[in-house]
Amino acid sequence: MTHELDATGLLCPLPVLKARKRLRALEPGGLLVLRTDDPAAIIDVPHFCAEAGHHLETQAEDGNAMIWTIRRG
């Protein structure tokens, strides 16, 4: 099952903190789709995934927003 988190309008570190909380609730291998328009997320989200042991599956642009698919490690 894929879970979604819309963090549009939130500035870092809030998108990463909310993603961390949501990922903790998922089983290993679970998917989270994170949407954010924070420009700092381009650096923060991949760094968070690498540090926390999660796998960044996809990264895409949608207008002013970025959409990340993260698989829980």
Show where each model-derived region lies:
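Right-handed parallel beta-helix/beta-solenoid
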Residues: 1-6
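Amphipathic, hydrophobic secondary-structure cores in small proteins
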Residues: 7-58
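Short acidic/glycine-enriched loop/turn segments that link adjacent beta-strands
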Residues: 63-65
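Core SAM-dependent methyltransferase catalytic element
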Residues: 67-73
